[in-house]
Amino acid sequence: MAMISHRLRRALLTATSYVNRSISSSITPASDFPSVSAAVLKRSVIGRSTEVATRAPARLFSTRQYKLYKEGDEITEDTVLFEGCDYNHWLITMDFSKEETPKSPEEMVAAYEETCAQGLGISVEEAKQRMYACSTTTYQGFQAIMTEQESEKFKDLPGVVFILPDSYIDPQNKEYGGDKYENGVITHRPPPIQSGRARPRPRFDRSGGGSGGPQNFQRNTQYGQQPPMQGGGGSYGPQQGYATPGQGQGTQAPPPFQGGYNQGPRSPPPPYQAGYNQGQGSPVPPYQAGYNQVQGSPVPPYQGTQSSYGQGGSGNYSQGPQGGYNQGGPRNYNPQGAGNFGPASGAGNLGPAPGAGNPGYGQGYSGPGQEQNQTFPQADQRNRDWNNNNPAGQPGSDQVRSRSIMNLASFFFDILIRH
């Protein structure tokens, strides 16, 4: 910045001399201008440059008060752009890296004194009186009091890099930078404190980013492991959760019913769960409309609400070769001889057949390849205690309610299958 102000000052001086020459040339008549010889013009230019050169030292070392520049002020010869930059104090930087042996701090200071004496054409003792600061750490160079014309003599000296007008590093105390130098005595000063960047705001998604904000939590691999509800058979038990393989009790309770769900091989199908309470070690008992399953995967028959219904006879829930999950054939749940999801022809509702015993769940099932009154495994019979509470042929109020719900469910499933 100090170099910019120095160049700006020179530009102003050059512009002033150019304006003066323009005014003098405009006053001279046009007829007399060609008669002016080159020698006269040369003497005029030399005279003007000499006048400026002789006037500058008097101005620099005068007691005139300089005015610090403020935004909007007019820049004149007495304007100081930086506080302390009066063109009497100069900073000269040097470079010792090109030398074969590095210099110690004492050798650097001795080189500063010799360079100052050589540039000003004075002795080393006089140069020590001119120097007021130097540095061997933050930068390599020295500061000395001299005129602008004297500073130009340092351009061709070995080791000199920059020649800059110096300014205050501490305007309040009017202190220049570097270590203080007084007649060969160096007083070290701490380096200037630079204002650091503002730290970014803490990120709560990083470790150690601060307290009080939201943190990342680990997901639980099991969702909602809850025991079955205690109550009547007509109530709906809560979903038991979907545990990952190898955890829990070896049972996977898939998510609720999803229509048109396509699933790859060897993956547990997500079934329709209507009051389904799951036990230990039981296979996945799904029902799903439009569910496509590869052949060979074992699928138990449809399991509805916990109310029991008998199967067998003319009023049973008969199922033919295409009943249940059709494997390899049509992908819907159609009993034999029925165009919808419901009981066989001639059956009014899902109820116990004539002569049937206890209408327990999964008893009296008739189908191809199965004998009458064949029961399912114990793991597939849900809530057996509840099924034995009512005598044979006498359904309770919960059974009637469950049958009504089952009829409504079959009606809606039929609509889903058709559409």
From Swiss-Prot:
It comes from the Eukaryota. GO terms for molecular function: protein dimerization activity. Residues 310-327, 357-367 have a biased composition (Gly residues). One of its GO terms (cellular component) is chloroplast. The keyword Transit peptide applies. Residues 237-252, 342-356 have a biased composition (Low complexity). Signal peptide: none annotated. Pfam families: MORF_dom. Residues 371-401 have a biased composition (Polar residues). GO terms for biological process: chloroplast RNA modification; cytidine to uridine editing; mitochondrial RNA modification; mRNA processing. Disruption phenotype: Embryonic lethality when homozygous. Gene3D superfamilies: Peptidase S8 propeptide/proteinase inhibitor I9. Keywords: Mitochondrion, mRNA processing, Transit peptide. It is found in: Mitochondrion. Residues 174-401 are annotated as: Disordered. InterPro entries: MORF/ORRM1/DAG-like (IPR039206), MORF/ORRM1/DAG-like_MORF (IPR054059), S8pro/Inhibitor_I9_sf (IPR037045). Residues 1-60 form a transit peptide. Its main location: mitochondrion. Involved in organellar RNA editing. Required for the processing of numerous RNA editing sites in mitochondria. Binds to the mitochondrial MEF19 and MEF21 factors, two pentatricopeptide repeat-containing proteins involved in RNA editing. PANTHER family: MULTIPLE ORGANELLAR RNA EDITING FACTOR 1, MITOCHONDRIAL, MULTIPLE ORGANELLAR RNA EDITING FACTOR 2, CHLOROPLASTIC-RELATED-RELATED. Homodimer and heterodimer with MORF3. Heterodimers with MORF8/RIP1, MORF4/RIP4 and MORF6/RIP6. Interacts with PCMP-E90/MEF13. Interacts with PCMP-H13/MEF35. Belongs to the MORF family. This is Multiple organellar RNA editing factor 1, mitochondrial. It comes from Arabidopsis thaliana.
